[in-house]
Amino acid sequence: MFKKVENKANFPKIEEKILKFWNDNKIFEKSMKQREGCEEFTFYDGPPFATGLPHFGHFVPNTIKDIIPRYQTMRGKYVKRNFGWDTHGLPVEYEVEKKLGISGKYEIENYGIENFNKECKKIVLRYTEEWKNIILRLGRWVDFEKGYKTMDINFMESVWWVFKSLYNKGLIYESYYVLPYSPKLATPLSNFEVNLGEYKEVNDPSLTIKFKIKDKNEYLLAWTTTPWTLPSNLGIAVGQEIEYSKIFDKKKEEILILGSKKLDSYYDDENSYTIIEKFKGSKLEGIEYEPIFNYFLEQKDKGAFKVHMADYVTTDDGTGIVHIAPFGEEDYRILKKHTNVDIIDPLDAECKFTNRVKDFQGLFVKDADKKIIENLKLRNFLFKRENYLHRYPFCYRTNYPIIYRPISSWFVNVEKIKTKLLEVNEKINWMPAHLKKGRFGKWLENAKDWAISRNRFWGNPIPIWICSKTGKKICVGSKKELESLSGQKIEDLHKDKVDKITWPSKDGGTFIRTSEVLDCWFESGAMPYASNHYPFTNESNFKNIFPADFIAEGLDQTRGWFYTLTILGVSLFESTAFKNVIVNGLVLSSDGRKMSKSFKNYTDPMEVINTFGADALRLYLIMSPVVKADDLKYSDNGVRDVLKNIIIPIWNAYSFFTTYAIIDKFQPPKNLNLVKNNNLDKWIISELESLKKILNNEIDKYNLTKSIESLLEFIDKLNNWYIRRSRRRFWKSENDKDKNDAYETLYYAIKTLMILLAPFIPFITEEIYQNLKTDEDKQSIHLNDYPKANENLINKTIEEKINLARKITSMARSLRSLHNIKIRMPISMIYIVTKNQNEQNMLIEMQEIILDEINAKEMKIKSNEEDLITYKAKANFKELGKKLGKDMKTVSIEISKLKNEDIIKIINGISYEIKVGNTKYYLSLNDIILEREEKDNLKVINEESITIGIDSLITKELYLEGLTREFVRQIQNLRKEKNFDVSDRINLYIENNETLQEILNKFEKYIKTETLALNIIFNKSKLEKKINLDDNIFTIIGIEKC
């Protein structure tokens, strides 16, 4: 016997109860146990940082990462779900710096690297319990106990193996290169880390500087927006084909050279200068000039202080002449190509000038701009100063400006494997698909060598030891190898430990480790190997778990984790590291801004779960554009709407079934016979079997959007058609076969639907299943196999018939709404127009249902719209504009004059001739836009090939019937308000008025049947609620149980 179900459910409390049921009965563990030995489905979980609490942005991928493994487990696969933690890197160090009140490399070194790393280890997992509680409360099944941490020695050792494998393949090299650099963190960043940060609009000083040509009183006017780079100037760049002008500035009495196109930008009055000559930039090549600062004069003999050709120079901004210092990627390339200058970098780790630039020593580069400008102005090198508004990158961790500077770093040679990267990308199933060729594919096409070293402390040390005497390098790939080389026992691989490990070289030097640590993205990219301690353990099973069948993360990971996984997969095995990926977009606040505690622009996620339930939140996220890698403007109201429009209707269907099943003592038979006689039963069973096919197909393709859409469509069909149209079958007093078939069908539909929904909304489905399951059923809904379609029960003919009836009903309801005709008000006639003979035949079969649904007395089927409307036409300018040209206006006037019968001919495929002068034009249906004018009292609507019309004239008889239906609805509402049981018989009390008397005279029996009223009594003392039957018709009613 089923338990009684409350109409109003507290879903968060139900979810807490289900969590306890899962924990007490170890359901997750059982779901894993029963699939042991089955085909393995590999899922990689991208490791988050545990330095902050999870937010809505984490909830999206965590929901996706729950749905797919649940589904695959129900499909009979063995799916390991081990949680991972990203424990190294800048995010952790930055948190510790804030905690300790220290900042920068020097202060950390003074504090002590060992002490600093101890603090990192303490803080790194401070939120793990909160993460565990929140993720489990979201309904995600994942094993936290067997999870991995990137700081574990086994994980770190496998990362060393990955590094050495790349090193041995010639894919690792050390070099100076201009890299994005975080001054606050005192370390270079990779290009994709820069993209993780924010580009802000900034106002930088824009300077035009005079560079004096050697042995001449002539000056090159060079432009820059980075004054701080001027002390390191080593060259000047011009465009080879750009035209330059040598002018005499009458006011300054100086000879100046700048791009000809830029003269108007610098001089308002062309009489203020005289053009001496014009020439191409190639004429300036090799010209020497006098340096504006004397800090690096020794570089002159190595080719510094000359003019070079550069294809990146334009006249869009500035003067068409650009100063060169080794702080820009293009500048650095030009200097390397044309000179032998040394690497000039007069900055310390925090981007403050060193004593190489004594006048500005100790100043942060951006702060030095002002003093440098003053210096240049004082010495008459400053020609012009302006402000330049442009977008500039800021560090994604410190929100501090990024500085580009030449720095020694270790790189992965991505250029060398770029062709293979693009090749393996073709084998990945991206969801959404456009990312393959779009965002990810384009990123691979433009991929640069990856800077993987960080001048930091809490990370996996780069395992290279260098001989102090010869520079010989040894790359270490394991703990055992390091022990063998050093003769020391290794217990920990962190920097503060391994930096102490040295050993003598045969050449009389000492092997000392290079000081850098690995970019933490290298570690996360190595996760498939390191989380399994490959190749030191699990080597034989590795081929079964690589590449992953599935991963999921946010859009930003196209330049992060997805990218590093692919680089290392290709480098190691010439393979992608994953076969299928679902990419989600950003979750923003309702105002479109980034969610921020400081902005107070979002609700605490746990408050949302405790208010609406995790199921509602999961469904809201999965239904949204965020699952298609688009942004979502999060709204609490959106979650509330999902609860109201989806979760509660599911509950109502379940409540409806159990309520009547308890009354009639219905018990499902052991073997349900699903071959039914009633068309409604046949239809909903067929729709359910078709749904199974769709879901198995779409989830297998990782198309969650299509899957959810199909589930929601079925829920609507079940609630708003099957149950609503079957109500009277459950209300019958006698338990005949039809009533029993209705019970069996609805039981099967709800129970099966719950199993189909279980991966998406695991709580409510478990709650409902627990009440519906029989003794033969599995202990938990999540221990079931995912349902597969029974093709024998799919009846496409009946699906088409009823779905056509539903379409007509929907159109008629829209038409009523458009013209303010209430659904309870009967109409005398509906006309349905379709030329399709098959549709006409189906409409005849569905006539009784359609008339009942739309509350109409009669239905007529037509083949031609003109029985309901007259046509007018307008010119379709989009089509005609291409072929009419100057005659367009004349023809459009003629089209507007077309008669109804002419337009009908055009609709029927007969072209219509219009003559303009001696030219004839022939109109087809594509050339005109139809306008419909309704006949008489008809109201008409058209959708694709179907047109319907309703007679809007309401007679008095129809009007009274409509009032009766509204009267019944109000009585039913009062029954609900007073918590009467659906089977309770009542006495109905009413006031005596003329309108009610008319209603009773005609519809008393109908009212009693619908409301279970045994008696209708005029009794003023029992009246309790005023009701509105129509705009100006009110009455008072009361009810009591008999």
From Swiss-Prot:
Sorted UniProt keywords: Aminoacyl-tRNA synthetase, ATP-binding, Cytoplasm, Ligase, Metal-binding, Nucleotide-binding, Protein biosynthesis, Zinc
GO BP annotation list: isoleucyl-tRNA aminoacylation
Self-association and partners: Monomer.
UniProt name for this protein: Isoleucine--tRNA ligase
Reaction(s) catalysed by this chain's protein: tRNA(Ile) + L-isoleucine + ATP = L-isoleucyl-tRNA(Ile) + AMP + diphosphate
Function of the protein: Catalyzes the attachment of isoleucine to tRNA(Ile). As IleRS can inadvertently accommodate and process structurally similar amino acids such as valine, to avoid such errors it has two additional distinct tRNA(Ile)-dependent editing activities. One activity is designated as 'pretransfer' editing and involves the hydrolysis of activated Val-AMP. The other activity is designated 'posttransfer' editing and involves deacylation of mischarged Val-tRNA(Ile).
Record motif 'HIGH' region, residues: 48-58
GO cellular component entries: cytoplasm
Species of origin: Borreliella afzelii (strain PKo)
Principal localisation: cytoplasm
Swiss-Prot/TrEMBL domain comment: IleRS has two distinct active sites: one for aminoacylation and one for editing. The misactivated valine is translocated from the active site to the editing site, which sterically excludes the correctly activated isoleucine. The single editing site contains two valyl binding pockets, one specific for each substrate (Val-AMP or Val-tRNA(Ile)).
Cofactor(s) annotated in UniProt: Zn(2+)
Molecular function as annotated in GO: aminoacyl-tRNA deacylase activity; ATP binding; isoleucine-tRNA ligase activity; tRNA binding; zinc ion binding
Entry's localization field: Cytoplasm
Alphabetized Pfam families for the sequence: Anticodon_1, DUF5915, tRNA-synt_1
